[in-house]
A protein has these predicted regions:
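Conserved Class I S-adenosyl-L-methionine
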Residues: 44, 147, 164-225
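A short glycine-rich, Lys/Arg-flanked "PGG" loop and its adjoining helix->strand segment in the class I
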Residues: 108-122
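Class I SAM-dependent methyltransferase Rossmann-like catalytic core
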Residues: 1-29
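A short SAM/SAH-binding and catalytic strip from SAM-dependent methyltransferases
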Residues: 94-107
Length: 225
């Protein structure tokens, strides 16, 4: 991933991620009060601003692995190591994250998140499924190891009973194959590895995929009982 270089262009390019943030906020009643909120993977705060407008809260703690020099105080650390930090001993009635989970070891961090969640607390997450950016995977061979809807549900069922999972598919269309990869670059996602964008490669992409790019968002709403 390459989010810092794309900092100035990310919010404009990451239309799907912004839409996912809107979908997550729809799961929460307007003006619902939360005593303690923890959001991880906050990046430049696009989802943070949406969620803060939707709810009422006493304390809101932010995390990200990178320092974007935000005006808000952000705890900088790798969420894969959350169990090693004092924050993991606190209790929250809302833990949220938008379009971050795919970068993490979900099975590893979920027990800690479950312990951090207070009784009747809500876990509100979005990620991407196994068909995310499938055109890129087929054309370059490069991909993250995305979990399927079934795999995510199975992991959640080890710790929770009230589980709601939804998935969607969004296909974006571009004017040229070069625009597809420019979109990915501007949104901070490096899906090419060391692959070179030759004219032959771009023509082949256009022929096979008609300059389309598919996202596979997954939405998770869990309540601790």
């Amino acid at each position: 991933m390459n989010f810092l270089k794309a900092k100035s262009s990310y919010e404009k390019a990451a239309k799907v991620q912004n839409w996912m943030g809107d979908r997550l906020c729809e799961k929460i009643p307007a003006n619902k009060f939360f005593d303690q909120v923890f959001e991880f993977g906050c990046a430049q705060g696009e989802f943070t601003r949406k969620l803060k407008k939707k709810i009422i809260f006493k304390k809101y703690i932010l995390n990200d692995i990178l320092d974007y020099k935000s005006q808000d105080k952000v705890e900088i650390f790798d969420m894969n190591d959350i169990a090693q930090y004092p924050l993991s001993t606190q209790k929250f009635d809302l833990i949220a994250s938008n379009a971050t989970l795919q970068w993490l070891n979900f099975k590893k961090i979920l027990p800690t998140l479950a312990n951090m969640l207070d009784t009747k607390g809500i876990l509100l997450l979005s990620t991407f499924g196994e068909k995310n950016l499938e055109q890129i995977t087929k054309s370059t061979g490069f991909s993250l190891k995305y979990l399927s809807l079934f795999e995510i549900k199975k992991i959640l069922q080890e710790h929770f009973f009230e589980i709601l999972i939804e998935e969607d598919f969004i296909t974006l269309e571009f004017e040229s194959p070069l625009e597809v990869f420019r979109h990915l670059k501007l949104s901070g996602v490096n899906s090419l590895g060391h692959h070179t964008l030759t004219k032959t490669f771009l023509k082949d992409y256009e022929k096979k995929f008609q300059n389309k790019l598919t996202y596979h968002p997954i939405f998770i709403y869990v309540k601790k009982v």
